[in-house]
């Protein structure tokens, strides 16, 4: 099992976002702004869904990695740290999904 974490990915996205856009895809996406990054996130989500529906496990793994990466870029542009997302997940898992949904 890999020791690589989402926190590692967040750090890498942060570092690469500071590079010149012509040298880094991450920097290029960040420079293009949230509409471009969010569109790319949506494209990757669709590709992951298609891989899941067709049962292509290898492609689903590949597309899930793309999806997580692009989500981290969108969060970076929005100024939302991964810790905030993890905190929300922790809050939600403290109760059943049905209870959480009813509380909205």
Curated annotation (Swiss-Prot):
Metabolic or biological pathway: Amino-acid biosynthesis; L-histidine biosynthesis; L-histidine from 5-phospho-alpha-D-ribose 1-diphosphate: step 2/9
Disulfide-bond pairs as recorded: none
Principal EC category: hydrolase
Family annotation (InterPro entries): HisE, PRib-ATP_PPHydrolase-like
Reactions catalysed according to its record: 1-(5-phospho-beta-D-ribosyl)-ATP + H2O = 1-(5-phospho-beta-D-ribosyl)-5'-AMP + diphosphate + H(+)
UniProt-listed Enzyme Commission number(s): 3.6.1.31
One GO BP annotation of this record: L-histidine biosynthetic process
Superkingdom of origin: Bacteria
The protein's name in its UniProt record: Phosphoribosyl-ATP pyrophosphatase
Organism: Rhizobium rhizogenes (strain K84 / ATCC BAA-868) (Agrobacterium radiobacter)
């Amino acid at each position: 099992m890999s020791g690589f974490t989402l926190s590692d990915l967040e750090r890498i996205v942060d570092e690469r976002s500071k590079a010149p856009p012509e040298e880094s895809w991450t920097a290029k996406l960040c420079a293009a702004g949230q509409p471009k990054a969010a569109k790319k996130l949506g494209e990757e989500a669709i590709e992951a869904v298609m891989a899941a529906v067709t049962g292509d496990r290898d492609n689903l793994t590949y597309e899930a990695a793309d999806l997580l990466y692009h989500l981290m870029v969108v969060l970076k542009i929005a100024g939302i740290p991964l810790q905030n997302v993890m905190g929300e997940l922790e809050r939600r898992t403290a109760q059943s999904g049905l209870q959480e949904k009813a509380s909205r």
